Design a protein with these regions (language model features):
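Bacterial N-terminal signal peptides
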Residues: 8-17
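Compositionally biased alpha-helical segments
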Residues: 18-91
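Amphipathic N-proximal alpha-helical interface segments
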Residues: 79-91, 105-188, 204-263
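Active-site-adjacent structural segments surrounding the nucleophilic cysteine of cysteine proteases
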Residues: 83-101, 107, 216-222, 229-340, ...
Length: 465
């Protein structure tokens, strides 16, 4: 579908605004003139690249009056360039020409994206926008900002996709066709707008492993890479990262086994009441979709310093219409990706007992637990967690816990299959801590190990060194 004439005129003006001029003549107060490329302008100085390729900083007050005026004009023009990006996207993404020196919380504040997770080194902000909201004149279904060491690190925007599309309980052929057309339409619109603004894209591929590898179209602007991914009948997404990260195909710096082992051990928290649990696990809110498996894997992978995105993992898990995913498909696809990061995924068919959980939590390793999350189970978990928060007499709580465990029987509801993380244990009370991908309110709930075994599917998974 062609864009309207008004939008085409807007894009034409954006193209003109985004053009980068090179070869600027500047002179000092002595009258010496040189040809340079202006790289960066600060209030008191400018960064320039000389004809021989060397880069240096020069004090603005040492320039001639004409050059100072010219630099001020360039500064004004440069400031307007980030505004054209904001106008193109339709959101206040930038406050200047560099997103990557902004703190993640400030970016999220101006975007009005809510905090999802905050750890010692990582943060994330996520929003599921209303149906009438638009980015790049296209409806986004999910928007996320990731921070690393306090600074903005990655923006992920998911447009039309199989998991978020509105279907009946039994999808009709017309609904499926509408989804396919929406994915195709969104891709065409995004490609046209980005190409009109930045020129023809480069082709690039990301990822390793069946179902995880993506073919991307890439546009660059002033250290920002705009990466559009589309899978037929699956999804369309746009990621914004630094050009340096994009050149490295989004891979993070690999940690040695020793460095990662030290990091995971440092994440272990021991409380006076005997609780032992793992901190600094990123939270992901899967939203209304049945994305518990990919969301849980994203949390674990990011905890292990491996970049991950639940939408891409969902594609690897052969997402069903409406959002259901296959654990076995995700594991088969993720296994090679994890191996490429020098890590190993293990499946263990062990009962849910405190001594089993303790072996891995004491190494700083969370456990992916497949279970049945019925209404009865969640009522039980919520009630126990609420009661637990008010406890001061832990000896009495131990007695109460043991008595309740013997009297409580939870049934396996096969219609409520779920995956979550086991993140802690209490050896004295016989409890384990679980964490679900439903947002901060579900980051830590405590249940008895006996009841956990009653609703377990029989398998646990972990990623090790």
């Amino acid at each position: 579908m062609k864009l309207s004439t008004a939008i085409q005129l807007l894009l034409a003006s954006l193209v003109a605004a985004l053009q980068t001029s090179q070869g600027t003549a500047i002179s000092n107060k002595a009258g010496t003139t040189i040809e340079v490329e202006i790289l960066n302008i600060e209030p008191e100085r400018i960064q320039i690249r000389l004809e021989n390729g060397n880069e240096t900083w020069f004090e603005r007050d040492q320039l001639s009056a004409d050059s100072q005026q010219a630099i001020s004009q360039i500064e004004t023009q440069e400031q307007s360039k980030f505004e054209t990006i904001n106008q193109l996207f339709g959101i206040p993404l930038l406050r200047d020409n560099n997103l990557w020196d902004d703190t993640a919380d400030k970016v999220a504040e101006r975007l009005n994206w809510r905090l999802e997770s905050q750890t010692a080194t990582q943060s994330s902000y996520r929003v599921y926008p209303h149906a009438d909201f638009r980015i790049l004149n296209t409806r986004p279904y999910a928007c996320a900002l990731y921070g690393a060491n306090e600074h903005a690190d990655l923006v992920s925007i998911v447009f039309a996709n199989k998991g978020d599309f509105n279907f009946s309980d039994t999808p009709t052929e017309d609904e499926i066709e509408a989804m396919q057309k929406a994915i195709e339409h969104d891709e065409d619109t995004l490609v046209e707008r980005l190409t009109n603004a930045f020129g023809q894209p480069e082709k690039q591929s990301f990822g390793t492993g069946r179902g995880i590898k993506e073919r991307l179209q890439r546009w660059d602007w002033k250290g920002h890479a705009f990466l559009l991914a589309s899978q037929e009948d699956e999804y369309v997404s746009l990621r914004i990262m630094s050009t340096e990260a994009a050149d490295n195909k989004g891979r993070s710096k690999k940690l040695s086994d020793a460095a990662l082992r030290k990091l995971t051990i440092e994440n272990i928290i021991t409380r006076p009441n005997g609780d032992v649990l793992i901190g600094n696990i990123p939270m992901v809110n899967q939203g209304p979709k049945g994305y518990c498996v990919p969301a849980t894997f994203e949390r674990y992978l990011r905890y292990m310093q491996i970049p991950a995105d639940m939408y891409l993992l969902a594609m690897a898990g052969q997402t069903e219409i409406g959002g259901g995913t296959s654990l076995s498909s995700i594991i088969n696809s993720v296994d090679s990706y994890i191996s490429s990061q020098s890590r190993t995924m293990k499946q263990l068919n062990e009962p849910i007992k405190v001594r089993t959980i303790q072996k891995y939590i004491d190494k700083g390793l969370p456990i992916i637990w497949t279970m049945f999350s019925s209404n009865a189970y969640n009522q039980y978990a919520n009630q126990r967690t609420a009661e637990r928060q008010a406890i001061t007499d832990w000896r009495a709580w131990k007695t109460t816990t043991q008595s309740n465990a013997r009297r409580t029987e939870l049934r396996k509801d096969i219609m409520s299959a779920h995956a979550c993380l086991i993140i802690g244990y209490n050896k004295d009370t016989g409890e384990i801590a679980v964490s679900d991908s439903w947002g901060p309110s579900y980051s830590e709930r405590w249940i008895c190990a006996e009841q956990a075994e009653q609703v377990s599917q029989g398998s646990i998974y972990l990623i090790s060194f």
